Swiss-Prot record:
Native source organism of the sequence: Rattus norvegicus
Known partners and oligomeric status: Forms disulfide-linked homodimers at the cell surface. Interacts with LCK. Interacts with PTK2/FAK1. Binds to P4HB/PDI. Interacts with IL16; this interaction induces a CD4-dependent signaling in lymphocytes. Interacts (via Ig-like V-type domain) with MHCII alpha chain (via alpha-2 domain) and beta chain (via beta-2 domain); this interaction increases the affinity of TCR for peptide-MHCII. CD4 oligomerization via Ig-like C2-type 2 and 3 domains appears to be required for stable binding to MHCII and adhesion between T cells and APCs.
Positions of the Ig-like V-type domain: 28-127
Regions of this protein lying in the Cytoplasmic compartment: 418-457
This protein's name: T-cell surface glycoprotein CD4
């Protein structure tokens, strides 16, 4: 009886002691981390106070711990990247911090705390950008997600401020990148309802627009500016041009860019170009004419690829070949929706057609205007002064020159007449003076003779 009684009373005590020795294993917590980044593995105390703890690897090697007011650390060679947040211990939090994550860090870590075991599963993933995060306009970017073989294709989603959202599992590609796609992309990897976000900085190098068009009247200067975000890139450039009436394209100018300085290598003399020596690339034609109207391609060759920019030049010319005809002509690439309009200034359109050449017969004298418009937008306009009927430009020029010549002849005759009159006046004055002197001399001689005769008597 005594021995039975003793056993019945000792059994609860033995179970109580055994419960203190047993370590309770709980469910695993999953933590995601990106290669090269940091990860924080949680371990919380229910008492919310400082306590002894130990972090161990899956093979039971001690990484670090705290016991009897002493900090315990494992092999420095193996765990130099591992640490904890000591200022959180007083609050009952004992996290394991792993810096500069490696793919081989993916494993199960065990936190022993208050006679309990907390298992934390760390999944480290690697993101590969092909061909990189600095690309040329029009190129494609492929993002590949590598993770632990045990993980089956975790989904990834990337967002950009341009409202681009790309979703896929393990890998995705973005095609025909634009300059607007440059900037910070926020990507999120999801696994077992756990999410890890990281930023991707993407730089897309290229032109601000895929094509530019200049609308100019004949005789005006045309300027083409090519804003680029190339940084310190070096390149070779060429502008090839095909005039509207030319059978084929030709090289207009070749140049190079090195250390932010532009150097012209070869250029045509007709038209004559002016190229800026610094960025942004600026190309100027001092005087355009109908023969230059057309389109071309600016090609920039860089180490990482080739960039293209379409360039268009539309030229307008308004002429009055004779007194009975007014002509407006446009050459260069225009939209089928564009319309040519001829009208007198501040009046209704006389002619309005979707053609490149329009005419007005017997135009009234005054200021005439030719406009090239697309819808409500006027792309360009040019003005001309129309002379009265029967007085064309040649006649007007002849009249002006004749009048000028007549004026010069009249002025010359007036000057000659004035000089002659002056000469005559001077000659008359001189003759008058001579007569006066002669008169005075005769008077003196007569007086002398009379005095001499008187003396003889």
């Amino acid at each position: 009886m005594c021995r039975g009684f003793s056993f019945r009373h000792l059994l609860p005590l033995l179970l109580l002691q055994l419960s203190k020795l047993l370590v309770v294993t709980q469910g695993k917590t999953v933590v995601l981390g990106k290669e090269g980044g940091s990860a924080e593995l949680p371990c919380e105390s229910t008492s919310r106070r400082s306590a002894s703890f130990a972090w161990k690897s899956s093979d039971q090697k001690t990484i670090l711990g705290y016991k009897n007011k002493l900090l315990i650390k494992g092999s420095l060679e193996l765990y130099s990247r591992f640490d904890s947040r000591k200022n959180a211990w007083e609050r009952g939090s004992f996290p394991l911090i792993i810096n500069k994550l490696r793919m081989e860090d993916s494993q199960t870590y065990v936190c022993e705390l208050e006679n309990k075991k907390e298992e934390v599963e760390l999944w480290v993933f690697r993101v590969t950008f092909n061909p990189g995060t600095r690309l040329l306009q029009g190129q494609s970017l492929t993002l590949i997600l590598d993770s632990n073989p045990k993980v089956s294709d975790p989904p990834i989603e990337c967002k950009h401020k341009s409202s681009n959202i790309v979703k896929d599992s393990k890998a995705f590609s973005t095609h025909s990148l634009r300059i607007q796609d440059s900037g910070i992309w926020n990507c999120t990897v999801t696994l077992n309802q756990k999410k890890h976000s990281f930023d991707m900085k993407l730089s897309v190098l290229g032109f601000a627009s895929t094509s530019i068009t200049a609308y100019k009247s004949e005789g005006e200067s045309a300027e083409f500016s090519f804003p680029l975000n190339l940084g310190e890139e070096s390149l070779q450039g060429e502008l090839r041009w095909k005039a509207e009436k030319a059978p084929s394209s030709q090289s207009w100018i070749t140049f190079s860019l090195k250390n932010q300085k532009v150097s012209v290598q070869k250029s045509t003399s007709n038209p004559k170009f002016q190229l800026s020596e610094t960025l942004p690339l600026t190309l100027q034609i001092p005087q355009v004419s109908l023969q230059f109207a057309g389109s071309g391609n600016l090609t920039l060759t860089l180490d990482r690829g080739i960039l293209y920019q379409e360039v268009n030049l539309v030229v307008m010319k308004v002429t009055q070949p004779d007194s009975n005809t007014l002509t407006c002509e446009v050459m260069g690439p225009t939209s089928p929706k564009m319309r040519l309009i001829l009208k007198q200034e501040n009046q209704e359109a006389r002619v309005s057609r979707q053609e490149k050449v329009i005419q007005v017969q017997a135009p009234e004298a005054g200021v005439w205007q030719c406009l090239l418009s697309e819808g409500e937008e006027v792309k360009m306009d040019s003005k001309i002064q129309v002379l009265s009927k029967g007085l064309n430009q040649t006649m007007f020029l002849a009249v002006v020159l004749g009048s000028a010549f007549s004026f010069l002849v009249f002025t010359g005759l007036c000057i000659l007449f004035c000089v002659r009159c002056r000469h005559q006046q001077r000659q008359a004055a001189r003759m008058s003076q001579i007569k006066r002197l002669l008169s005075e001399k005769k008077t003196c001689q007569c007086s002398h003779r009379m005095q001499k005769s008187h003396n003889l008597i």
